[in-house]
Amino acid sequence: MKNGAFPHDNAAVPNVERVLPLFSLKGRTAIVSGAGAGIGLAVAQAFAEAGANVAIWYNSNKQAVTSAEDIAKTYGVKCKAYQVNVTSAEAVDKAITEIIKEFNGRLDVFVANSGITWTEGAFIDGSVESARNVMSVNVDGVMWCAKSAGAHFRRQKEEGTTIDGKPLDNFIAGSFIATASMSGSIVNVPQLQAVYNSSKAAVIHFCKSLAVEWTGFARVNTVSPGYIITEISNFVPPETKTLWKDKIVMGREGRVGELKGAYLYLASDASSYTTGLDMIVDGGYSLP
């Protein structure tokens, strides 16, 4: 932006007329953090099915290693698991650079999906350590991933080359997607989770701001799931889930597979004119 105006015609247009090819990720490289299970693993599977080579990051769930092998075998792409601490800017930057070198010299998509919940009830009764941990993983983790991924997106657009100096084919713009939450826009009941809610609100606004900063070389969007059946919510008692369903227009929790389309859309050229979007996928919970 200069003098309050964005550069005209700064975003390239895909040279594709038919709709299905727009969703292809063939030959591209994607990194998905928090992909040991749940939403992140489903997203990695979707990207691989669409033709992408995928690096999946995990924190402690070593099942990710086997999952990566299964993805590679099933979809005929390169897929490998990496243990990365997203709260460390240095670890994130090192991992991203090494993955780009190890894969095909490029980065096309980054999904910042790592996140943890708040389980200590009212904020004033919870521990300072837990609050800091939620913010460190949910907010700092997204920022450090964005900082490193964005630098690679910008270099690729400016230089038109892979990391080892070869011509970069079919790179229109990078796509950075962060997993936020409907909790970033509403206040959940009956559970009390002010820290978690505010962490996701921060992610949404951070990504909207990056969408402005990164115009010309990358698109930035968020996906805000509602109540989705994953391991992260196994601790929730059945009576609480019943109260959730009372407030969901569709009357049930979502499945991780029902989020695949949202992430694939935002990762692919199908969303070439979409940036700064917070896509809420919550079965209608936020409507009433």
From Swiss-Prot:
Belongs to the short-chain dehydrogenases/reductases (SDR) family. One of its GO terms (molecular function) is L-xylulose reductase (NADPH) activity. This is L-xylulose reductase. The gene is lxr3. GO terms for biological process: L-arabinose catabolic process to xylulose 5-phosphate. Its EC number is 1.1.1.10. InterPro entries: NAD(P)-bd_dom_sf (IPR036291), Sc_DH/Rdtase_CS (IPR020904), SDR_fam (IPR002347). The keyword NADP applies.
